[in-house]
Regions:
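Sec-dependent N-terminal signal peptides
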Residues: 4-13
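N-terminal signal peptide c-region/cleavage motif recognized by signal peptidases
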Residues: 14-19
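Mature extracytoplasmic or organellar-lumen-exposed domains after removal of signal/transit peptides
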Residues: 20-214
Length: 214
């Protein structure tokens, strides 16, 4: 019997070591790759929204710099298409792409032409077409010759503020979900993680591990 137990222990040792190594890899990906990058996105998006509140002009160099910094931060996490970024279409709200039918400029043009009051409050703005939200919408408002001069300057200003505030809200929500629950779910599965939901979390953990070399 002792020989059988010893043999089983020897046989299972590599599996235990593999599981521990995999868990360590997932932990490293989350703590060194995912969370720092989403923190940067949230911080730069907050700075973008604050800059727009101070100067919403499309020609503002400060606003364009803030946009570039926040957009670069988004690009750094845009491959992490699982978990909190997919809740409520947050990733699409940040970057509606691809846009083969030109929905973003069409949506923005309609908003500006109608001076749509949806831009006046965060709750109503969050209900507009997702094509009119996020970084690509802001890019049109800052750099497109037609949209950056169309309609009322006051309304364009309000729209820029609405878009940037929404970007900040979505970015912060993704980070908050990672920090307050989702990371722990991947790092510390419980007995309840067995079954279909557990397999789903295991697949997500595997996907999380896959990004370690990016």
């Amino acid at each position: 019997m002792k020989k059988l137990i010893l043999a089983a222990a020897i046989a299972l040792a590599p599996l235990a070591s593999w599981a521990e190594t995999k868990a360590d890899t997932v932990r490293d990906v989350i703590t060194q790759h995912i969370l720092p990058r989403y923190s940067t996105l949230a911080e730069t998006s907050d700075e973008l929204a604050a800059t727009a509140q101070a100067d919403c002009s499309a020609a503002s160099e400060a606003l364009r710099r803030a946009y570039n910094s926040a957009f670069d931060a988004w690009i750094a996490v845009s491959h992490l298409r699982f978990g909190p970024s997919e809740l409520n279409n947050r990733a699409f709200a940040l970057a509606y792409w691809p846009d083969s039918r030109g929905a973003t400029p069409k949506t923005l043009a309609a908003l500006i032409a109608d001076a749509d009051p949806a831009a006046n409050t965060p709750d109503t703005f969050a209900e507009i077409s997702i094509a009119g939200r996020g970084f690509y919408a802001l890019e049109f408002l800052l750099y497109d010759d037609q949209l950056s001069t169309m309609g009322s300057a006051d309304y364009r200003c309000a729209l820029v503020k609405a878009v940037t505030a929404d970007i900040a809200v979505q970015s912060r929500a993704i980070l908050d979900d990672w920090q307050h629950g989702y990371a722990d779910t991947l790092l510390s599965p419980t007995d309840t993680s067995r079954g279909p939901q557990g397999r789903k979390r295991g697949a997500l953990a595997g996907r999380c591990e896959m990004w370690c070399c990016r």
